[in-house]
Amino acid sequence: MEDRALKSLNHFSIFRFTEEYWRLESADRRDVHRSWFAGLQEVAGLGTVHRYQLFPTEPLADLMLWCAVEADSNEAPAKFFEGFAKATVPHRRYVEPRISLWGLTRRSQYSKSRSRQEVDPFGEKRAPYLIIYPFTKTADWYLMNQETRQGMMNEHIRIGKRYESIKQLLLYSFGLQDQEFVVVYETDDLAVFSQLVNDLRMTEARRFTLGDTPVHTAVYHTPEEALSIWC
């Protein structure tokens, strides 16, 4: 992971295309996409904007956007949110926002060094699948001492290392959204990822999970691939 990824804002937004969008001719739908994404990329600047397909993994949403920008100043989040809104508002007749999940990166208190399994949000290459969900611990978790929590997290980390091909990004959203974290995984094999989650269900730390739904499973697409699906 690059150093700039250690302090970044990652914003995941889920959209549904409206009936008015589907009434457009194919060429006009392409124009909507190109205009909208050009505006979003301008907002992201040196950051990234990635496109993901949701339907048919879930029935009420079509598209997920992942925007990653550096959060190197107090003004950076406000600048991004303002720019995202300005880029999206002209197209609201065609796209309906459904869900937004976002948070900030920081160093983990349970790991002394960076893991090779950390997702680099600014990396050019993306895995075929992305899984994302909100996550909240119980109050009892935070009332335990650091040593006890560290022991349970060590078990969690050991299991994760068995699945070297799966990468994770943990976003902190305490006091910013309803959840405490946003958990993001990248994988090229959904069956292997499902087995990882199954194994993690049997850890002691699982007792202290308050919420980890809804889960969104998305498929990555390049800009041209996205046009071939939605246009």
Predicted regions located by residue number:
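Small/polar loops that bind or transfer phosphate-bearing groups
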Residues: 185
